[in-house]
UniProtKB/Swiss-Prot annotation:
Belongs to the PINc/VapC protein family. The gene is vapC25. GO terms for biological process: negative regulation of growth. This is Ribonuclease VapC25. GO terms for molecular function: magnesium ion binding; RNA nuclease activity. It comes from Mycobacterium tuberculosis (strain CDC 1551 / Oshkosh). Its EC number is 3.1.-.-. Mg(2+) binds at D5, D108. Its cofactor is Mg(2+). Keywords: Hydrolase, Magnesium, Metal-binding, Nuclease, Toxin-antitoxin system. The keyword Glycoprotein does not apply. Toxic component of a type II toxin-antitoxin (TA) system. An RNase. Its toxic effect is neutralized by coexpression with cognate antitoxin VapB25.
C-alpha cells in the first residue's frame, strides 16, 4: 500500500506547481489502478491549509475546489483510510531516535510511523524520508 504525502497531492492538484506536469500523470495512473493507497487525515489537513493559503500561492485554490479534490481522491474504491494505531507512539519514538529527528522533521516521522504500522511505502517528493531506515520511500517522477 502507498501512503501519499502532501507534496505529491499539491503537485497533482495545482496546475501552477513546478512538478505538476510529471506528478499529475503519475497520480492519475495511481487513481486508475487497483493498488491500495491511503492519505491520512493529517495529510489532508496540511493539503487544505497549504493549497488555500495566500502566503503560499499567489492565487490559492478555492476551498470548495480543494475539498472537491479531497473528496474525489477519498472516494476511490482502493483508497483505504488509516490513522495512527496503538503502536504509533512507540514507532514514532523509534523513528525519531534513528534519524535524530526534531523540529520540522517530526511531521515526517509521524507519517513514517503511520506507514510502518500499516505496511505502507511513503510516496513523497521530500528526500527527508530517506533518513528513516525503516520507512520505505518512493519518489514519483519529477
Amino acid at each position: 500500500m502507498f501512503l501519499i504525502d502532501v507534496n505529491v497531492l499539491l503537485a497533482a492538484h495545482r496546475g501552477d506547481h513546478p512538478n505538476h506536469r510529471t506528478v499529475r500523470p503519475w497520480f492519475d495512473r495511481l487513481l486508475a489502478a487497483d493498488d491500495p493507497f491511503t492519505v491520512p487525515n493529517l495529510v489532508w489537513a496540511s493539503f487544505l491549509r497549504l493549497t488555500t493559503n495566500r502566503r503560499i500561492f499567489e492565487i490559492p485554490s478555492p476551498r470548495a475546489d480543494a475539498f472537491a479534490f479531497v473528496e474525489a481522491v477519498n472516494a476511490q474504491p482502493h483508497h483505504l483510510p488509516t490513522s495512527p494505531g496503538p503502536r504509533h507512539l512507540v514507532l514514532l519514538r523509534k523513528l525519531c531516535d534513528e534519524a535524530d529527528a526534531s523540529g520540522d522533521l517530526i511531521p515526517d516521522a509521524v507519517l513514517g510511523a503511520i506507514a510502518v504500522e500499516h505496511h505502507c511505502a511513503v510516496v513523497s517528493l521530500d528526500r527527508d524520508f530517506a533518513r528513516f531506515a525503516s520507512v520505505r520511500h518512493i519518489r514519483p517522477p519529477i
